[in-house]
UniProtKB/Swiss-Prot annotation:
SUPFAM superfamilies: Serpins. Gene3D superfamilies: Alpha-1-antitrypsin, domain 1, Antithrombin, subunit I, domain 2. The gene is SERPINI2. This is Serpin I2. GO terms for cellular component: extracellular exosome; extracellular space. The lineage of its organism: Eukaryota, Metazoa, Chordata, Craniata, Vertebrata. It comes from Homo sapiens.
Length: 405
Protein backbone atom coordinates (compact mmCIF):
# COMPACT_ATOMS: atom_id res chain seq x y z
CA UNK A 1 0.00 0.00 0.00
CA UNK A 2 1.44 3.36 -1.05
CA UNK A 3 1.98 6.06 1.54
CA UNK A 4 2.20 9.82 1.57
CA UNK A 5 4.27 11.70 4.13
CA UNK A 6 3.41 15.24 5.15
CA UNK A 7 6.19 17.22 6.76
CA UNK A 8 5.83 20.76 7.95
CA UNK A 9 9.28 22.06 8.82
CA UNK A 10 9.26 25.42 10.44
CA UNK A 11 11.88 27.79 11.65
CA UNK A 12 11.06 30.88 13.64
CA UNK A 13 13.99 33.11 14.55
CA UNK A 14 13.13 36.14 16.62
CA UNK A 15 16.17 38.36 16.32
CA UNK A 16 15.84 41.42 17.22
CA UNK A 17 -5.02 39.81 1.92
CA UNK A 18 -6.80 37.02 3.05
CA UNK A 19 -10.35 38.16 3.79
CA UNK A 20 -11.39 38.95 7.38
CA UNK A 21 -13.73 35.95 7.30
CA UNK A 22 -10.89 33.66 6.22
CA UNK A 23 -8.64 35.05 8.98
CA UNK A 24 -11.39 34.38 11.53
CA UNK A 25 -11.70 30.76 10.39
CA UNK A 26 -7.93 30.30 10.42
CA UNK A 27 -7.84 31.64 13.98
CA UNK A 28 -10.55 29.20 15.05
CA UNK A 29 -8.55 26.31 13.57
CA UNK A 30 -5.36 27.56 15.24
CA UNK A 31 -7.10 27.57 18.62
CA UNK A 32 -8.50 24.07 18.01
CA UNK A 33 -4.99 22.83 17.26
CA UNK A 34 -3.55 24.51 20.34
CA UNK A 35 -6.16 23.03 22.67
CA UNK A 36 -5.42 19.52 21.37
CA UNK A 37 -1.63 19.89 21.38
CA UNK A 38 -1.68 21.23 24.94
CA UNK A 39 -3.41 18.06 26.16
CA UNK A 40 -0.40 15.91 25.30
CA UNK A 41 2.39 18.44 25.89
CA UNK A 42 2.62 19.69 29.46
CA UNK A 43 5.74 21.84 29.13
CA UNK A 44 6.94 24.12 26.33
CA UNK A 45 4.87 24.20 23.14
CA UNK A 46 5.68 25.74 19.77
CA UNK A 47 3.90 24.97 16.51
CA UNK A 48 2.60 26.68 13.38
CA UNK A 49 -1.11 26.61 12.52
CA UNK A 50 -0.11 28.05 9.14
CA UNK A 51 2.19 25.11 8.41
CA UNK A 52 -0.48 22.54 9.28
CA UNK A 53 -3.07 24.42 7.23
CA UNK A 54 -0.79 24.41 4.20
CA UNK A 55 -0.07 20.67 4.21
CA UNK A 56 -3.76 19.87 4.76
CA UNK A 57 -4.70 22.15 1.88
CA UNK A 58 -2.11 20.41 -0.30
CA UNK A 59 -3.87 17.12 0.44
CA UNK A 60 -7.33 18.64 0.02
CA UNK A 61 -6.34 19.79 -3.46
CA UNK A 62 -6.41 16.12 -4.50
CA UNK A 63 -8.92 14.72 -1.99
CA UNK A 64 -12.46 13.64 -2.81
CA UNK A 65 -15.52 12.49 -0.88
CA UNK A 66 -15.21 11.99 2.87
CA UNK A 67 -11.51 12.86 2.95
CA UNK A 68 -12.20 16.26 1.43
CA UNK A 69 -15.28 16.86 3.58
CA UNK A 70 -13.40 16.20 6.83
CA UNK A 71 -10.59 18.60 5.93
CA UNK A 72 -13.01 21.34 4.88
CA UNK A 73 -15.06 20.91 8.06
CA UNK A 74 -12.02 21.01 10.35
CA UNK A 75 -10.64 24.07 8.55
CA UNK A 76 -14.05 25.79 8.99
CA UNK A 77 -14.67 26.02 5.24
CA UNK A 78 -18.26 24.72 5.12
CA UNK A 79 -19.65 28.15 4.27
CA UNK A 80 -17.29 28.76 1.35
CA UNK A 81 -17.49 27.33 -2.14
CA UNK A 82 -15.22 24.34 -2.76
CA UNK A 83 -11.96 25.57 -4.25
CA UNK A 84 -12.33 29.15 -3.01
CA UNK A 85 -9.80 28.50 -0.24
CA UNK A 86 -7.04 27.87 -2.80
CA UNK A 87 -7.46 31.31 -4.35
CA UNK A 88 -7.33 32.81 -0.84
CA UNK A 89 -4.03 30.98 -0.33
CA UNK A 90 -2.78 32.25 -3.68
CA UNK A 91 -3.51 35.80 -2.53
CA UNK A 92 -1.73 35.08 0.77
CA UNK A 93 1.41 33.90 -1.04
CA UNK A 94 1.32 37.02 -3.20
CA UNK A 95 1.01 39.20 -0.08
CA UNK A 96 4.04 37.68 1.64
CA UNK A 97 6.29 36.99 -1.35
CA UNK A 98 7.39 40.59 -1.79
CA UNK A 99 10.88 40.98 -0.36
CA UNK A 100 11.20 43.53 2.43
CA UNK A 101 14.30 45.08 3.95
CA UNK A 102 12.86 45.11 7.48
CA UNK A 103 12.64 41.33 7.85
CA UNK A 104 13.20 37.97 6.18
CA UNK A 105 10.18 35.73 5.71
CA UNK A 106 10.54 32.71 3.46
CA UNK A 107 7.70 30.25 2.91
CA UNK A 108 8.58 27.29 0.70
CA UNK A 109 6.78 24.11 -0.30
CA UNK A 110 8.15 21.07 -2.10
CA UNK A 111 6.64 17.90 -3.49
CA UNK A 112 8.95 14.87 -3.77
CA UNK A 113 7.69 12.11 -6.10
CA UNK A 114 8.83 8.54 -6.51
CA UNK A 115 10.28 8.10 -10.00
CA UNK A 116 7.73 6.30 -12.14
CA UNK A 117 4.80 7.04 -9.78
CA UNK A 118 2.04 8.68 -11.78
CA UNK A 119 0.59 11.86 -10.33
CA UNK A 120 -2.14 13.71 -12.17
CA UNK A 121 -0.97 16.72 -14.13
CA UNK A 122 -3.80 18.85 -12.77
CA UNK A 123 -2.62 18.19 -9.20
CA UNK A 124 0.96 19.13 -10.06
CA UNK A 125 -0.26 22.29 -11.79
CA UNK A 126 -2.42 23.21 -8.78
CA UNK A 127 0.53 22.79 -6.40
CA UNK A 128 2.58 25.18 -8.50
CA UNK A 129 -0.22 27.72 -8.89
CA UNK A 130 -1.60 27.81 -5.34
CA UNK A 131 1.38 26.71 -3.20
CA UNK A 132 4.34 27.66 -5.43
CA UNK A 133 5.61 24.13 -4.80
CA UNK A 134 8.86 22.86 -6.22
CA UNK A 135 8.38 19.39 -7.71
CA UNK A 136 11.25 16.91 -7.58
CA UNK A 137 11.63 13.27 -8.69
CA UNK A 138 13.49 10.91 -6.34
CA UNK A 139 13.99 7.20 -5.76
CA UNK A 140 12.73 6.32 -2.28
CA UNK A 141 14.29 2.88 -2.65
CA UNK A 142 17.51 4.68 -1.74
CA UNK A 143 16.02 5.97 1.50
CA UNK A 144 19.27 7.36 2.89
CA UNK A 145 20.01 9.44 -0.20
CA UNK A 146 16.43 10.77 -0.25
CA UNK A 147 16.63 11.71 3.43
CA UNK A 148 19.87 13.59 2.81
CA UNK A 149 18.45 15.37 -0.24
CA UNK A 150 15.27 16.56 1.49
CA UNK A 151 17.15 17.44 4.68
CA UNK A 152 19.53 19.59 2.62
CA UNK A 153 16.54 21.42 1.11
CA UNK A 154 15.12 22.02 4.59
CA UNK A 155 18.47 23.22 5.91
CA UNK A 156 18.86 25.65 3.02
CA UNK A 157 15.31 27.03 3.35
CA UNK A 158 15.71 27.52 7.12
CA UNK A 159 19.09 29.25 6.87
CA UNK A 160 20.87 26.27 8.40
CA UNK A 161 18.90 26.22 11.66
CA UNK A 162 17.25 22.81 11.10
CA UNK A 163 19.81 20.17 10.16
CA UNK A 164 19.51 16.41 9.52
CA UNK A 165 15.73 16.56 9.67
CA UNK A 166 15.22 13.17 8.07
CA UNK A 167 16.79 9.76 8.43
CA UNK A 168 16.62 6.87 6.01
CA UNK A 169 14.32 4.97 8.38
CA UNK A 170 11.52 7.47 7.74
CA UNK A 171 11.16 6.43 4.11
CA UNK A 172 10.57 2.97 2.68
CA UNK A 173 9.67 0.99 -0.44
CA UNK A 174 6.01 2.03 -0.14
CA UNK A 175 6.75 5.76 0.02
CA UNK A 176 5.45 7.48 -3.10
CA UNK A 177 4.96 11.12 -2.23
CA UNK A 178 6.43 13.46 0.39
CA UNK A 179 4.98 16.94 0.91
CA UNK A 180 7.32 19.33 2.70
CA UNK A 181 6.67 22.81 4.03
CA UNK A 182 9.41 25.06 5.43
CA UNK A 183 9.02 28.50 6.99
CA UNK A 184 11.81 30.84 8.00
CA UNK A 185 11.32 34.16 9.75
CA UNK A 186 13.92 36.54 11.09
CA UNK A 187 12.92 39.97 12.26
CA UNK A 188 14.19 42.84 14.37
CA UNK A 189 12.06 44.33 17.10
CA UNK A 190 10.57 47.69 16.19
CA UNK A 191 11.76 48.79 19.65
CA UNK A 192 14.75 46.75 20.62
CA UNK A 193 15.96 45.49 24.00
CA UNK A 194 19.47 46.54 25.05
CA UNK A 195 21.74 43.58 25.74
CA UNK A 196 23.43 45.41 28.60
CA UNK A 197 20.09 45.55 30.44
CA UNK A 198 19.62 41.76 30.42
CA UNK A 199 19.92 40.21 33.88
CA UNK A 200 19.82 36.74 35.41
CA UNK A 201 16.44 36.41 37.11
CA UNK A 202 14.56 33.52 38.73
CA UNK A 203 11.82 32.03 36.54
CA UNK A 204 9.17 30.04 38.41
CA UNK A 205 8.25 26.92 36.46
CA UNK A 206 4.80 25.34 36.43
CA UNK A 207 5.76 22.87 39.17
CA UNK A 208 6.82 25.69 41.49
CA UNK A 209 10.58 25.19 41.17
CA UNK A 210 12.78 28.03 39.93
CA UNK A 211 15.52 28.32 37.32
CA UNK A 212 17.91 31.19 36.58
CA UNK A 213 17.26 32.63 33.11
CA UNK A 214 18.47 35.70 31.17
CA UNK A 215 15.68 38.27 31.44
CA UNK A 216 15.55 41.04 28.83
CA UNK A 217 14.36 44.40 30.14
CA UNK A 218 13.07 47.56 28.50
CA UNK A 219 10.66 50.43 29.00
CA UNK A 220 8.59 50.59 25.81
CA UNK A 221 5.50 52.31 24.52
CA UNK A 222 3.39 49.49 23.11
CA UNK A 223 -0.09 47.93 23.14
CA UNK A 224 -1.03 46.50 26.52
CA UNK A 225 -4.11 45.35 28.42
CA UNK A 226 -5.05 44.00 31.84
CA UNK A 227 -8.00 41.59 31.85
CA UNK A 228 -10.07 39.93 34.56
CA UNK A 229 -12.51 37.18 33.64
CA UNK A 230 -13.97 34.16 35.45
CA UNK A 231 -11.87 34.93 38.54
CA UNK A 232 -8.74 34.90 36.37
CA UNK A 233 -6.45 37.91 36.07
CA UNK A 234 -3.95 38.20 33.25
CA UNK A 235 -2.07 40.68 31.08
CA UNK A 236 -1.72 40.84 27.30
CA UNK A 237 1.17 42.59 25.55
CA UNK A 238 1.83 43.13 21.84
CA UNK A 239 5.38 43.67 20.55
CA UNK A 240 5.83 44.74 16.93
CA UNK A 241 8.65 43.94 14.52
CA UNK A 242 10.23 46.47 12.19
CA UNK A 243 7.93 47.15 9.29
CA UNK A 244 4.83 46.42 11.39
CA UNK A 245 3.88 43.38 9.29
CA UNK A 246 4.46 40.94 12.15
CA UNK A 247 3.80 41.16 15.87
CA UNK A 248 4.12 38.95 18.93
CA UNK A 249 1.27 38.77 21.43
CA UNK A 250 2.13 37.51 24.93
CA UNK A 251 -0.52 36.38 27.43
CA UNK A 252 0.74 36.38 31.02
CA UNK A 253 -1.42 34.99 33.86
CA UNK A 254 -1.21 36.70 37.23
CA UNK A 255 1.54 35.20 39.36
CA UNK A 256 0.32 32.08 41.15
CA UNK A 257 -2.48 31.41 38.67
CA UNK A 258 -2.58 28.14 36.72
CA UNK A 259 -1.67 28.74 33.10
CA UNK A 260 -3.93 25.87 32.04
CA UNK A 261 -6.94 27.78 33.36
CA UNK A 262 -6.05 30.76 31.18
CA UNK A 263 -5.59 28.43 28.20
CA UNK A 264 -9.21 27.34 28.54
CA UNK A 265 -10.30 30.95 27.92
CA UNK A 266 -8.63 31.15 24.52
CA UNK A 267 -11.02 31.34 21.58
CA UNK A 268 -10.91 33.17 18.27
CA UNK A 269 -13.35 35.71 19.69
CA UNK A 270 -11.18 36.18 22.78
CA UNK A 271 -8.11 36.89 20.68
CA UNK A 272 -10.04 39.48 18.66
CA UNK A 273 -11.20 41.05 21.93
CA UNK A 274 -7.62 41.40 23.17
CA UNK A 275 -6.53 43.01 19.92
CA UNK A 276 -9.40 45.50 19.96
CA UNK A 277 -9.22 46.42 23.66
CA UNK A 278 -5.47 46.79 24.20
CA UNK A 279 -4.31 50.39 24.47
CA UNK A 280 -0.93 51.86 23.67
CA UNK A 281 0.92 52.89 26.82
CA UNK A 282 4.33 52.89 28.44
CA UNK A 283 5.14 49.48 29.91
CA UNK A 284 8.06 48.18 31.95
CA UNK A 285 8.78 44.83 30.26
CA UNK A 286 10.78 41.85 31.50
CA UNK A 287 10.82 39.01 28.98
CA UNK A 288 12.94 35.83 28.97
CA UNK A 289 15.56 35.26 26.32
CA UNK A 290 15.13 31.68 25.22
CA UNK A 291 15.14 29.16 22.41
CA UNK A 292 12.99 26.07 21.88
CA UNK A 293 13.19 23.37 19.23
CA UNK A 294 10.29 20.96 19.08
CA UNK A 295 9.02 18.20 16.81
CA UNK A 296 5.31 17.39 17.03
CA UNK A 297 3.43 14.45 15.53
CA UNK A 298 0.06 15.84 14.48
CA UNK A 299 -1.57 12.56 13.45
CA UNK A 300 -3.34 12.04 16.80
CA UNK A 301 -4.17 15.74 17.02
CA UNK A 302 -5.88 15.68 13.63
CA UNK A 303 -7.66 12.45 14.56
CA UNK A 304 -9.11 14.26 17.57
CA UNK A 305 -10.29 17.05 15.25
CA UNK A 306 -12.07 14.48 13.05
CA UNK A 307 -9.55 14.30 10.23
CA UNK A 308 -9.31 10.50 10.05
CA UNK A 309 -10.10 9.47 6.49
CA UNK A 310 -6.79 10.55 4.93
CA UNK A 311 -4.96 8.13 7.25
CA UNK A 312 -6.94 5.08 6.11
CA UNK A 313 -6.10 2.81 3.19
CA UNK A 314 -9.49 3.35 1.57
CA UNK A 315 -9.39 7.15 1.40
CA UNK A 316 -10.17 8.86 -1.89
CA UNK A 317 -7.16 10.82 -3.08
CA UNK A 318 -8.06 10.29 -6.72
CA UNK A 319 -7.32 13.93 -7.46
CA UNK A 320 -3.66 13.12 -6.82
CA UNK A 321 -3.32 9.73 -8.50
CA UNK A 322 -5.40 6.90 -9.92
CA UNK A 323 -3.77 4.50 -7.46
CA UNK A 324 -6.49 3.24 -5.11
CA UNK A 325 -4.20 2.48 -2.17
CA UNK A 326 -2.64 5.84 -1.41
CA UNK A 327 -3.01 7.34 2.06
CA UNK A 328 -1.26 9.70 4.46
CA UNK A 329 0.91 8.00 7.07
CA UNK A 330 2.40 10.94 8.97
CA UNK A 331 1.89 14.65 9.59
CA UNK A 332 4.92 15.94 11.45
CA UNK A 333 6.12 19.45 12.17
CA UNK A 334 9.39 20.75 13.52
CA UNK A 335 9.93 24.30 14.73
CA UNK A 336 13.00 26.18 15.88
CA UNK A 337 12.04 29.22 17.94
CA UNK A 338 14.40 31.82 19.35
CA UNK A 339 13.77 35.17 20.97
CA UNK A 340 16.51 37.56 22.04
CA UNK A 341 17.39 41.23 22.34
CA UNK A 342 18.69 41.82 18.82
CA UNK A 343 17.43 44.74 16.84
CA UNK A 344 18.61 47.00 14.05
CA UNK A 345 20.96 49.82 14.99
CA UNK A 346 19.01 51.97 12.51
CA UNK A 347 15.77 51.52 14.45
CA UNK A 348 13.86 54.76 14.89
CA UNK A 349 12.62 53.85 18.37
CA UNK A 350 14.76 52.21 21.03
CA UNK A 351 13.97 50.74 24.44
CA UNK A 352 14.83 52.96 27.38
CA UNK A 353 17.41 51.81 29.91
CA UNK A 354 15.67 50.63 33.07
CA UNK A 355 17.15 52.06 36.29
CA UNK A 356 17.03 50.21 39.58
CA UNK A 357 14.17 52.38 40.87
CA UNK A 358 11.16 52.41 38.53
CA UNK A 359 8.24 54.82 38.56
CA UNK A 360 5.20 53.21 40.15
CA UNK A 361 3.05 54.87 37.48
CA UNK A 362 4.31 52.48 34.80
CA UNK A 363 2.44 49.28 33.94
CA UNK A 364 4.66 46.30 34.62
CA UNK A 365 4.76 43.17 32.49
CA UNK A 366 7.15 40.76 34.20
CA UNK A 367 7.18 37.35 32.49
CA UNK A 368 9.00 35.44 35.25
CA UNK A 369 6.50 32.56 35.18
CA UNK A 370 4.73 30.54 32.42
CA UNK A 371 3.09 32.47 29.59
CA UNK A 372 1.44 31.96 26.20
CA UNK A 373 2.33 33.64 22.91
CA UNK A 374 0.92 34.15 19.43
CA UNK A 375 2.71 35.47 16.37
CA UNK A 376 0.57 36.99 13.64
CA UNK A 377 0.95 38.43 10.17
CA UNK A 378 -0.88 41.73 10.47
CA UNK A 379 -1.86 42.45 6.84
CA UNK A 380 -3.71 39.11 6.55
CA UNK A 381 -4.54 38.74 10.26
CA UNK A 382 -3.15 35.19 10.04
CA UNK A 383 -1.74 33.35 13.06
CA UNK A 384 1.62 31.95 12.05
CA UNK A 385 2.78 30.50 15.37
CA UNK A 386 1.34 29.70 18.78
CA UNK A 387 3.02 28.39 21.87
CA UNK A 388 3.56 28.22 25.60
CA UNK A 389 6.71 28.75 27.64
CA UNK A 390 6.85 26.95 30.98
CA UNK A 391 10.61 26.42 31.21
CA UNK A 392 12.89 28.71 29.17
CA UNK A 393 16.27 27.24 28.26
CA UNK A 394 19.07 28.78 30.32
CA UNK A 395 21.59 30.66 28.17
CA UNK A 396 24.83 32.43 28.93
CA UNK A 397 24.97 36.22 28.89
CA UNK A 398 28.04 36.82 26.78
CA UNK A 399 30.48 39.53 27.69
CA UNK A 400 29.23 39.97 31.22
CA UNK A 401 30.41 38.75 34.59
CA UNK A 402 27.43 36.79 35.85
CA UNK A 403 28.87 36.61 39.35
CA UNK A 404 28.42 40.36 39.62
CA UNK A 405 24.69 40.25 38.82
Amino acid sequence: MDTIFLWSLLLLFFGSQASRCSAQKNTEFAVDLYQEVSLSHKDNIIFSPLGITLVLEMVQLGAKGKAQQQIRQTLKQQETSAGEEFFVLKSFFSAISEKKQEFTFNLANALYLQEGFTVKEQYLHGNKEFFQSAIKLVDFQDAKACAEMISTWVERKTDGKIKDMFSGEEFGPLTRLVLVNAIYFKGDWKQKFRKEDTQLINFTKKNGSTVKIPMMKALLRTKYGYFSESSLNYQVLELSYKGDEFSLIIILPAEGMDIEEVEKLITAQQILKWLSEMQEEEVEISLPRFKVEQKVDFKDVLYSLNITEIFSGGCDLSGITDSSEVYVSQVTQKVFFEINEDGSEAATSTGIHIPVIMSLAQSQFIANHPFLFIMKHNPTESILFMGRVTNPDTQEIKGRDLDSL
